[in-house]
Amino acid sequence: MTNSAPVTPRRDLADAPLLAAARGETPRHTPVWFMRQAGRSLPEYRKVREGIPMLQSCLTPDLVCEITAQPVRRHGVDAAILFSDIVLPLHAAGVGLDIVAGTGPVVAEPVRTAADVAALPSLAPEQVSKVGDAVGLLLDELGSTPLIGFAGAPFTLASYLVEGGPSRNHERTKALMHSEPATWHALLEKLADTTLTFLRTQLAAGVDAIQLFDSWAGALSLRDYREFVLPHSRRIFEGVAETPGAAGVPKIHFGVGTGELLGAMRSAGADVVGVDWRVPLDTAAQRLREAGPDQGAPVVQGNLDPAVLFAGWEAVEREVRRILAEGRAAGGHIFNLGHGVLPSTDPGVLTRVVELVHAESAR
């Protein structure tokens, strides 16, 4: 697969703590950013998003630039992550879906048969060119702060398409996987193409790192993950590595509840493995070493429980210090939450977390 977008020369940010940590080097301090840092916890976000639908917001370059930069200005985080949504490339390709407040992505016509899969539209680079435009604006806006691009992994996108929306048990998804494996793999091949096109658009525009979100992979057993999911996620990471101008761009892989899948997720081609709050980082690092003894020292990202941010500063400070200590067992550590920032989080607490991480880890 190729991408026709012209390639923007990548910024020289070799000393940026996020990129140094992702390479397993020793940065001047432990880098910190937060999943969903650009979102409803910020009053400035709520103001600029007022009255504008989510998917429209994601395709408005000036707005994407402003929202992406807001947490960098407010918190002093070590990376920005592109404001977008994991279902955006499906929407851009022509899949009928909407993001319903209080529910999440809702698909008009679920994909449940081989014919449905065959009819699923492909994504062309020009359909997400506005995302590339937003990245271009951000490179000027962010200065020396790295920009992380991202996309949803095929399994998580498939779950939304097959279930028709968010699901607790993913029963239709797993049923299709086991009853019609050929149809399942055809679906994930198409979704891997879509995801790779979306990521290559961001890479061509100049993002400094990428994260593949497999939000719902934790619903799977290790056996099922290896058979039905891993080959398609691996193809994405291989495609990213082969993208012109993207050599050396760090690749992060994250899912919720994936403590038993960490080694397999790394083996897909990730340089950094995101860990949720359920597994201590030193335990995660040990699991990664055991699963891939020939892959070098693992780099981990995480993993403060987002709910702890509501517990008062004494508890937050204690947990941050514990996580920093556990992270030292890995070959590198990027501080983050174990999932996204919750909408009612006090942004002042996030700023204090950034300050604490920087102060405690200064080298």
Swiss-Prot record:
SUPFAM superfamilies: UROD/MetE-like. It catalyses: uroporphyrinogen III + 4 H(+) = coproporphyrinogen III + 4 CO2. GO terms for molecular function: uroporphyrinogen decarboxylase activity. The record marks 85 as: Transition state stabilizer. Its EC number is 4.1.1.37. Pathway: Porphyrin-containing compound metabolism; protoporphyrin-IX biosynthesis; coproporphyrinogen-III from 5-aminolevulinate: step 4/4. It is an enzyme of class 4 (lyase). Substrate binds at residues 36-40, 85, 160, 215, 339. InterPro entries: UROD/MetE-like_sf, Uroporphyrinogen_deCO2ase_HemE, Uroporphyrinogen_deCOase. It is found in: Cytoplasm. One of its GO terms (biological process) is protoporphyrinogen IX biosynthetic process. Transmembrane segments: none annotated. Keywords: Cytoplasm, Decarboxylase, Lyase, Porphyrin biosynthesis. Pfam families: URO-D. One of its GO terms (cellular component) is cytosol. Catalyzes the decarboxylation of four acetate groups of uroporphyrinogen-III to yield coproporphyrinogen-III. Homodimer. Belongs to the uroporphyrinogen decarboxylase family. This is Uroporphyrinogen decarboxylase. It comes from Saccharopolyspora erythraea (strain ATCC 11635 / DSM 40517 / JCM 4748 / NBRC 13426 / NCIMB 8594 / NRRL 2338). The lineage of its organism: Bacteria, Bacillati, Actinomycetota, Actinomycetes, Pseudonocardiales.
